[in-house]
Amino acid sequence: MSINAGTNGRKGGSGAFVVETSGLTKRFGDRVAVDDVDLHVPRGSAFGYLGPNGAGKTTLIRMLLGLTDASSGTMQVLGRTVPAERARALRRVGAIVEEPRFHGYLTGRENLSVIAAAREPEAHDRIDGALTRVGLSQRADERVKRYSLGMRQRLGVARSLLADPKLLILDEPTNGLDPAGIHEFRDMIRGFVAEGRTVLLSSHLLDEVEKICDQVAIVDRGRVVMQGSVEDLAADGAPTILVATSDDTRALGVLAHHRAVETMSEEPEGIRVTLRCDVEAENAADDIGRRMFEAGLAIRHFERTRASLEERFLEITSRLEEAA
């Protein structure tokens, strides 16, 4: 999918993108961890950087934050070049990289006070609001060594908010959260975006990215293989239909002989049918329904469905493995 760069990043980050990289590469000896990455993170988006563990996601984030040098390529954060303008670029950036670390013998509030002391005076005034925002106001005066991993993740987000960030960079932020915490986290991210902030979220969890993010880059073995809106990337995949009949065993036989059918699988709701990419989906779906009727099958449910981001991701990465 092509990306229209639109307005290029300008000083202060007033352009269309808050993160832009070109040819960004990082090598560790003979191993290429990040391979020629061109990344464009639109302003005001929830952007998922999606890939399996070991795909180079954390390494890219560390380069954006100036924590490790790139081997080659260029990058801009909020319109400023990193690492040359790192301090100014990161002034309005909040980040969690890997597991957030704190002083265990201090309370959550005291840890934030230590961080705020190194920032502008207004940072201290944001502590209470940040703790409330992440759901830790009732536990803020407990020592962090008593916090669960999920609570430390929340405290890490609170720490990020002390900068009143235009950009939040979160590396695997749902680690350690229970299902209720994950649901609250999704709402929190949506709230940040509604306020005009941009969130760059690195994750290997496809389902979470699809539920949280509106933009995504799919990364595999250090390379960005596709990027764009979640809706467009899923829609670019093979069309599918879900059909349930009076006799799904016979229906499988009908589908097996239809030229438009690529794959089919039985699910609790019926038969999931993936159509070939070279057929016109609407005509093929109509013809499948007609064949079912001619075979004497009663159709209980028939629905054209959108491929999930997970299905699209597996389609892309499996194709890359075959080409390797």
Label each region the model flagged.
Residues 2-9, 279-324:
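C-terminal coupling/interaction segments
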Residues 15-21, 26-220, 226:
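ABC transporter nucleotide-binding domains
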Residues 98, 201, 243-244, 301, ...:
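Small/polar loops that bind or transfer phosphate-bearing groups
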Residues 102-103, 276-279:
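Short histidine/acidic/glycine/proline-rich micro-motifs that form metal-
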Residues 117-120, 214, 260, 297, ...:
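Non-catalytic alpha-helical coupling and interface elements of nucleotide-dependent molecular machines
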Residues 123, 138, 262-263, 299:
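Residue-level detector of short coil/turn "hinge" positions at structural boundaries
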Residues 144, 268-269, 305:
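Residue-level "edge-of-site" marker
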Residues 186-276:
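ABC transporter nucleotide-binding domain
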